[in-house]
């Protein structure tokens, strides 16, 4: 999801999306540690998504 799409969401929706992304990152890290993660490039992408969401939440105040 890009920044323009995220900016259209409300603060509550962003918080839900943030929780979902953090859970996804946790699961990916676990699968990576047990050598079950196929696309390791998704790890940094998810981190960037979390950073984007946090930035937009700060902008909204």
Swiss-Prot record:
Cystines in this chain: none
SUPFAM superfamilies in alphabetical order: Ribosomal protein L29 (L29p) (SSF46561)
UniProt GO BP: translation
Keywords: Ribonucleoprotein, Ribosomal protein
Domain of life: Bacteria
Gene3D superfamilies assigned: 1.10.287.310
GO molecular function: structural constituent of ribosome
Signal peptide, first to last residue: none
GO cellular-component term (any): cytosolic large ribosomal subunit
Coiled coil: none
Entry-linked CDD domains: Ribosomal_L29_HIP
Pfam families in the record: Ribosomal_L29
InterPro entries recorded: Ribosomal_protein_uL29, Ribosomal_uL29, Ribosomal_uL29_sf
PANTHER family cross-referenced by the UniProt entry: 60S RIBOSOMAL PROTEIN L35/50S RIBOSOMAL PROTEIN L29, LARGE RIBOSOMAL SUBUNIT PROTEIN UL29C
HAMAP family, per the entry: Ribosomal_uL29
Family indicated by similarity: Belongs to the universal ribosomal protein uL29 family.
Entry-linked NCBIfam families: L29
Stated name of the protein: Large ribosomal subunit protein uL29
Naturally occurring in which organism (per UniProt): Nitratidesulfovibrio vulgaris (strain DSM 19637 / Miyazaki F) (Desulfovibrio vulgaris)
Source organism phylogeny: Bacteria, Pseudomonadati, Thermodesulfobacteriota, Desulfovibrionia, Desulfovibrionales
Gene: rpmC
């Amino acid at each position: 999801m890009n920044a323009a799409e995220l900016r259209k969401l409300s603060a509550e929706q962003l918080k839900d999306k943030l929780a979902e992304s953090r859970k996804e990152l946790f699961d990916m890290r676990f699968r990576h540690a047990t050598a079950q993660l196929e696309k390791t490039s998704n790890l940094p992408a998810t981190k960037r998504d979390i950073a984007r969401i946090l930035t937009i939440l700060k902008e909204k105040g």
